[in-house]
Amino acid sequence: MDDLFPLIFPSEPAQASGPYVEIIEQPKQRGMRFRYKCEGRSAGSIPGERSTDTTKTHPTIKINGYTGPGTVRISLVTKDPPHRPHPHELVGKDCRDGFYEAELCPDRCIHSFQNLGIQCVKKRDLEQAISQRIQTNNNPFQVPIEEQRGDYDLNAVRLCFQVTVRDPSGRPLRLTPVLSHPIFDNRAPNTAELKICRVNRNSGSCLGGDEIFLLCDKVQKEDIEVYFTGPGWEARGSFSQADVHRQVAIVFRTPPYADPSLQAPVRVSMQLRRPSDRELSEPMEFQYLPDTDDRHRIEEKRKRTYETFKSIMKKSPFNGPTEPRPPPRRIAVPSRGPTSVPKPAPQPYAFSTSLSTINFDEFSPMVLPPGQISNQALALAPSSAPVLAQTMVPSSAMVPSLAQPPAPVPVLAPGPPQSLSAPVPKSTQAGEGTLSEALLHLQFDADEDLGALLGNNTDPGVFTDLASVDNSEFQQLLNQGVAMSHSTAEPMLMEYPEAITRLVTGSQRPPDPAPATLGTSGLPNGLSGDEDFSSIADMDFSALLSQISS
């Protein structure tokens, strides 16, 4: 950058006969931000140009040809000649009225200046700051007052070092002022430091045209370009001002390389460049690749993925011989096969309105072994038997029927128990059913009195006297059952259940461990124990009903 400065402002004045000032450590030109006074914080410290994150340096001068007492004043002037006093101020230790002034150490000739910061002023306070420079005689190059009015570049300043020493006679001797390199405000995009932060890819085809997204610090879209340089070759990326996003991102296409028939990868430098001051950023490496059909680098990505997978498998603790695992245990899941037949849904039994519609020819007698008759009868007997009457007294009407000899009950020969097989009745017409099923579906409330239910009804349309009930049809049904029993000489259905037969014959059943709830008479059926009926056919129902009504 030294070739950009005029030779009339040398940093080392040609004075062979006397002392002179030399800047041995220039201030860092970019990367520092000027602070406003209203920010209420320190303006920082001006670093040296060789300053790093680990090694800090500061602006340093050397007084050649002199050792002894003296003073130094450091002030801010404009970047371009004539070097007028700048409205910005130096702040820090030993600073006043916008400049720094201190005594030099007489024992050394090299002096470093730390804790110097630059504080900027607002545009509305510009005239006031210039007037203050004139009043304090802060004008190193004695620029006339009328020339101090005008525009100022508020984004760039220079440090001016003014040193005063003693001559051999002890009188003050002012040495020639020395100017530093320009210092730019990092906040201004037209003077800020150029820096490439990140790119989405750092390689492309030698034919060019690859789209690249570049992130950077603040730039001006009309004063920025992407610069490619290589051995004997330079080019610029292709983009427009619309491709600069909010001054921090640039989308451009790579230029073609000088040799389109490239056979091996070539590395070049990629930089940001500001045409106004020819400022360049730190270079970033970019690689041009030979032109192939695989423009999207599928094979390269596949190879990289495969190598990564292999390295992971080598480091895996599960990589190695393992014992064979037993076959997985199968869990039995119930399933309905195609040959399985679903069970038919139970159908409600429809009873006929009259007993005369029942066909007794369809019924077959129920045969049980002698030892199982009482048990089966007890199992079929309900727990709560209906109470027929509160008091059961035999009347004279029932004496003839009781005097008749009981019908013989067929006894089977002892043998192995036979399983009950209910024959499937043939349905003759709708509404027909077996008498046994009809009797099983009859339900009575054990807590209600049948006589009370019949006697308490005041409806004239209902039977008021049980003697008026016509039981001739039911008597004919019973006689038909007796005739069938004598003709076939086989036990008939009407001889059961066995509980009624036991009551008729007067046989006593051994007591059960948990007897059922008894009726009023002390027996499950509400009958006395001395009543003997060998069959339900021998019972005189007319006398029984008249007994209940009385």
From Swiss-Prot:
Chain span(s) of sequence motif Nuclear localization signal? 301-304
Q: Which UniProt keywords apply?
A: Acetylation, Cytoplasm, Isopeptide bond, Methylation, Nucleus, Phosphoprotein, S-nitrosylation, Transcription, Transcription regulation, Ubl conjugation
Q: Which residues carry this modification: Phosphothreonine?
A: 254, 434, 505
Q: Which GO terms describe its biological process?
A: animal organ morphogenesis; antiviral innate immune response; canonical NF-kappaB signal transduction; cellular response to angiotensin; cellular response to hepatocyte growth factor stimulus; cellular response to hydrogen peroxide; cellular response to interleukin-1; cellular response to interleukin-6
- What GO molecular functions are on record for this protein? actinin binding; ankyrin repeat binding; chromatin binding; chromatin DNA binding; DNA binding; DNA-binding transcription activator activity, RNA polymerase II-specific; DNA-binding transcription factor activity; DNA-binding transcription factor activity, RNA polymerase II-specific
Q: N6-acetyllysine (modified residue): where?
A: 122-123, 218, 221, 310
Specify the RHD domain's residue ranges: 16-190
Q: How does it get modified post-translation?
A: Ubiquitinated by RNF182, leading to its proteasomal degradation. Degradation is required for termination of NF-kappa-B response. Polyubiquitinated via 'Lys-29'-linked ubiquitin; leading to lysosomal degradation.
Cross-link Glycyl lysine isopeptide (Lys-Gly) (interchain with G-Cter in SUMO3): residue positions: 37, 122-123
Spell out which residues are annotated as carrying Cysteine persulfide: 38
Region of interest (Transcriptional activation domain 3), ranges? 342-388
Q: Name one GO cellular component term.
A: cytoplasm
**PANTHER family (UniProt xref):** NUCLEAR FACTOR NF-KAPPA-B PROTEIN, TRANSCRIPTION FACTOR P65
Please give the subunit comment from the record. Answer: Component of the NF-kappa-B p65-p50 complex. Component of the NF-kappa-B p65-c-Rel complex. Homodimer; component of the NF-kappa-B p65-p65 complex. Component of the NF-kappa-B p65-p52 complex. May interact with ETHE1. Binds TLE5 and TLE1. Interacts with TP53BP2. Binds to and is phosphorylated by the activated form of either RPS6KA4 or RPS6KA5. Interacts with ING4 and this interaction may be indirect. Interacts with CARM1, USP48 and UNC5CL. Interacts with IRAK1BP1. Interacts with NFKBID. Interacts with NFKBIA. Interacts with GSK3B. Interacts with NFKBIB. Interacts with NFKBIE.
Q: According to its UniProt entry, what is the function of this protein?
A: NF-kappa-B is a pleiotropic transcription factor present in almost all cell types and is the endpoint of a series of signal transduction events that are initiated by a vast array of stimuli related to many biological processes such as inflammation, immunity, differentiation, cell growth, tumorigenesis and apoptosis. NF-kappa-B is a homo- or heterodimeric complex formed by the Rel-like domain-containing proteins RELA/p65, RELB, NFKB1/p105, NFKB1/p50, REL and NFKB2/p52. The heterodimeric RELA-NFKB1 complex appears to be most abundant one.
Q: What is known of its domains?
A: The transcriptional activation domain 3/TA3 does not participate in the direct transcriptional activity of RELA but is involved in the control by RELA of the accessibility of target gene promoters. Mediates interaction with ZBTB7A.
For this entry, the protein name equals: Transcription factor p65
